[in-house]
């Protein structure tokens, strides 16, 4: 009987469902393991073959840990708010709720057909009011702690679409959708004060078992730098320009200042002569994204304001310019330019013929900026000092003059949290007519997202919720005061910041999760997902977790102890899979043609889990052939167990079986699934070479195969005579003593020439080795008629005979 994957996979999926095989009990006394997948956004396209790669890896580990006696938490849910559903609703007139519900059903069917061992009783959905009640509750805690505030922020405003766009939705100054012009415009937005946690977010990375490259991405994003804040008085006005610099020692070389076009001082300091030029430049700059503005390759542009500032140490007058390469969101929105020692400033000074003053010796500033070390020159009291000493001295001089101080700066900006969209969590805030604002009382949560078929943008920059009077207008029952609800919604990141906490206690109506359960399950032991979430999702989740830790709600400082990024599965030609290239592989087709176990086995066998690897039909077929070989080894044509499997051990497989258990166990620990599978193949090859296979060994093999290919694992386990599921069977162990052979092969040389290879017992003495060698027929023929001068025996290696 051939292995019929369709029949067998359906049979075991039904069995697991009916028996709730993977239900996690909160047995708080048992050792635990929490294996987490990055939950998917349920798009209309359904699952693609990239999804199962990470999911299979966590599933293997979850099944392996259950067999090792761990209490395993392995849940799944849906990150279902966000733009694509809203866009679909706008384009088709359908309700995003219906669209989302349908997509989740498809995803869930596909995931179940792949045999993942999720506890579906813990499923979460970020759009479920019982879930987002707690997302809103966390927002209120952030607000109460002073970490959520309203600020005027420059956003990407698209008048044609009537809404604000994220940076990712703007390409070359126009909207990605429709190609409409986009402008930078200041608008009131909710912002979360993530910068308050910058130092902790940086320091605690050191304690995490994460890829170093990913930690570096977070370090760079936070971008901590030490330097000084310096204050330049604007000539003939009360104004001051504050700059942050990591090199206050070069202040004598600061020959001009550059402000961002949006800087608050620009309009007040610009002289009449330059007003028109400055205005035109500001308008142009408002059409560019931050990315375009800071592109190093682009030609520098800028305009003089007509105003001057006074260098606080040299007393020299320096020009004040505006240029779009300076962003209002970074540092103070102004820089002191030292063209002799900074490439970007040098380029700007050359273009606009501004002074270049050398203050560190060692270069030729006629030709290029010098950015190396050296002694200070043309720098007053700093002359003769090297960099570090000069920095310290410069800060001291600035402090004495009241013109500066030591300062730490971060590239990290506070998190712009509001979206002018419908399909997101309502922000639980009311703005009252007396100018105050309060959060919605906690007992009134969840604040429900109203159902409406009017989800077109409002056109005013507010979200579509602003169109729904019944939602917006409120009256305080006690005082009769009128108020308006906040109409912005939360970004898609909000629900994914804390979902791993809700899995721990998903049905709790009274609190986010039971503290005892949080204490038992946290931190997550293994988190697998794509590297595209390296910064935003992981940084935001760490931030929320740290706030909850400070509030005494979670017991750990960090959410995810070990993190692993799976690689990307490419199309057959090593190109990224995409609909436009027509090279997308649908897992449904593979499950139908080859089986879920084959897909799981193949994706784990393709190569290292973190590598980008091209899909190959040949490789897929090879994985299926291996499962067929395993089946044929164990199962007769009539479906009974092969008579080759016996209960007596003739020891022929002792070594390879014990080596296999050792290798697979070690490889599973390091997520080296491709090499573990290679070793399972080696074992099956050896089984085909012998007449009898010892039953406990084949049972051990099936236990090792089952986490990778669980359906065939269960079926073979039942063929071996077991009535219960393989899920909680103990993981096989190996015997160190059987990893090595009792026999060794020695070589026998006569006068240095190889004459024989002989297998002998490991513990054979030198004398016995000599006897065995001299009685070998080949050796006898070689020494016939000769006198033996010397016999040298090296235990376990060789016997050398010298004869004349």
UniProtKB/Swiss-Prot annotation:
State which Enzyme Commission number(s) the record gives: 6.1.1.4
Work out whether the entry's keyword set contains Aminoacyl-tRNA synthetase: yes
What are its GO cellular component terms? cytosol
GO annotation (BP), single: leucyl-tRNA aminoacylation
Amino acids binding ATP: 579
Q: Where is this motif: 'KMSKS' region?
A: 576-580
Q: Cite the entry's keywords alphabetically.
A: Aminoacyl-tRNA synthetase, ATP-binding, Cytoplasm, Ligase, Nucleotide-binding, Protein biosynthesis
Q: What GO molecular functions are on record for this protein? A: aminoacyl-tRNA deacylase activity; ATP binding; leucine-tRNA ligase activity
Subcellular location(s): the record lists: Cytoplasm
Q: Which enzyme type, at the first EC level?
A: ligase
**InterPro entries reported in the protein's UniProt record:** aa-tRNA-synth_I_CS, aa-tRNA-synth_Ia, Leu-tRNA-ligase, Leu_tRNA-synth_edit, M/V/L/I-tRNA-synth_anticd-bd, Methionyl/Leucyl_tRNA_Synth, Rossmann-like_a/b/a_fold, tRNAsynth_Ia_anticodon-bd
User: What catalytic activity is recorded?
Assistant: tRNA(Leu) + L-leucine + ATP = L-leucyl-tRNA(Leu) + AMP + diphosphate
Q: Tell me where the sequence motif 'HIGH' region sits in this chain.
A: 40-51
Give one Pfam hit by family name: Anticodon_1
* Xref: NCBIfam families: leuS_bact
What family does this chain come from, according to its entry? Answer: Belongs to the class-I aminoacyl-tRNA synthetase family.
This one is known as Leucine--tRNA ligase
Lineage, top ranks: Bacteria, Bacillati, Bacillota, Bacilli, Bacillales
């Amino acid at each position: 009987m051939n292995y019929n994957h369709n029949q067998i996979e359906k049979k075991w999926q039904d069995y697991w469902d009916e028996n709730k095989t993977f239900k996690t009990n909160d047995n708080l006394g048992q050792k635990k393991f929490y294996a987490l997948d990055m939950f998917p956004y349920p798009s209309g396209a359904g699952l693609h073959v990239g999804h199962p790669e990470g999911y299979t890896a966590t599933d293997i580990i979850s099944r392996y840990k259950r067999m090792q006696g761990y209490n395993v938490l392995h849940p799944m849910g849906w990150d279902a708010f966000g733009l694509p559903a809203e866009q679909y609703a706008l384009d088709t007139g359908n309700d995003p709720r219906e669209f989302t519900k349908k997509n989740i059903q498809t995803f869930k069917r596909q995931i179940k057909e792949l045999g993942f061992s999720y506890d579906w009783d813990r499923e979460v959905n970020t759009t479920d009011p019982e879930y987002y009640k707690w997302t809103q509750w966390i927002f209120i805690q952030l607000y109460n702690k002073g970490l959520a505030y309203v600020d005027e922020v420059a956003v990407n405003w698209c008048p044609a679409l009537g809404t604000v766009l994220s940076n990712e939705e703007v390409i070359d100054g126009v909207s990605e959708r429709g190609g409409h012009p986009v402008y930078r415009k200041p608008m009131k937005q909710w912002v979360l004060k993530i910068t308050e946690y910058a130092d902790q977010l940086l320091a605690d990375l050191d304690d995490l078992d994460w890829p170093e490259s990913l930690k570096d991405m977070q370090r760079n994003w936070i971008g901590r730098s030490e330097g000084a804040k310096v204050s330049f008085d604007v000539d003939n006005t009360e104004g001051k320009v504050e700059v942050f610099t990591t090199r206050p020692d070069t202040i004598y070389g600061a020959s001009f200042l550059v402000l961002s076009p949006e800087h608050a001082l620009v309009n007040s300091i610009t002289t009449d002569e330059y007003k028109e030029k400055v205005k035109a430049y500001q308008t142009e700059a408002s059409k560019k994204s931050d990315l375009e503005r800071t592109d190093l390759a682009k030609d520098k542009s800028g305009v003089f304001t007509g105003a001057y500032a006074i260098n606080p140490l040299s007393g020299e007058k320096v020009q004040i310019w505006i240029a779009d390469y300076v962003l209002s969101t970074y540092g103070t929105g102004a820089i002191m330019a030292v063209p002799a020692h900074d490439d970007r400033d040098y380029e700007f000074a050359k273009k606009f013929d501004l002074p270049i003053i050398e203050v560190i010796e060692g270069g030729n500033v006629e030709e290029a900026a010098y950015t190396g070390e050296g002694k200070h020159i043309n720098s007053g009291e700093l002359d003769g000092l090297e960099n570090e000493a000069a920095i310290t001295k410069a800060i001291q001089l600035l402090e004495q003059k009241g013109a500066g101080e030591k300062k730490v700066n971060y590239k990290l900006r506070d998190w712009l949290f509001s979206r002018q969209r419908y399909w997101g969590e309502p922000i639980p805030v009311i703005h009252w007519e007396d100018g105050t604002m309060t959060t919605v009382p906690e007992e009134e949560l969840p604040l429900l997202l109203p159902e409406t078929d009017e989800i077109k943008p409002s056109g005013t920059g507010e979200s579509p919720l602003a169109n729904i009077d019944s939602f917006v207008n409120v009256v305080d029952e006690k005082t009769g005061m009128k108020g308006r609800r906040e109409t912005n919604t939360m970004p898609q990141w909000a629900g994914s910041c804390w979902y791993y906490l809700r899995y721990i206690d998903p049905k709790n109506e009274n609190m986010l999760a039971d503290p005892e359960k949080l204490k038992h399950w946290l931190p997550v032991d293994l988190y697998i997902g794509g590297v595209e979430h390296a910064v935003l999702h992981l940084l935001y989740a760490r931030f929320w977790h740290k706030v909850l830790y400070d509030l005494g709600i979670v017991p750990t400082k960090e959410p995810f102890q070990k993190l692993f990024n799976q690689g990307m599965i490419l199309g057959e030609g090593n190109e990224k899979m995409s609909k436009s290239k027509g090279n997308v592989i649908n897992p449904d087709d593979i499950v139908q043609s080859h089986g879920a176990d084959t897909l799981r086995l193949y994706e784990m066998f393709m190569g290292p889990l973190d590598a980008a690897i091209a899909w190959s039909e040949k490789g897929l077929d090879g994985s299926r052939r291996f499962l067929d070989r395993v089946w044929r080894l164990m199962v007769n044509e009539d479906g009974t167990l092969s008579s080759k499997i016996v209960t007596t051990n003739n020891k022929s497989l002792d070594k390879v079986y014990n080596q296999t258990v050792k290798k697979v166990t070690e490889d599973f620990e390091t997520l080296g699934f491709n090499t573990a599978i290679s070793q399972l193949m080696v074992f099956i090859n050896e089984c085909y070479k012998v007449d009898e296979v010892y039953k406990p060994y084949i049972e051990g093999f099936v236990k090792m195969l089952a986490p990778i290919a669980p359906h065939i694992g269960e079926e073979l386990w039942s063929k071996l005579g077991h009535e219960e599921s393989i899920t909680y069977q103990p993981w096989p162990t190996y015997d160190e003593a059987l990893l090595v052979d009792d026999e060794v092969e020695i070589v026998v040389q006569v006068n240095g020439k190889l004459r024989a290879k002989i297998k002998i017992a490991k513990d054979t003495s030198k004398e016995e080795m000599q006897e065995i060698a001299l009685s070998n027929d080949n050796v006898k023929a070689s020494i016939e008629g000769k006198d033996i001068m010397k016999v040298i025996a090296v235990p376990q290696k060789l016997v050398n005979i010298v004869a004349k």
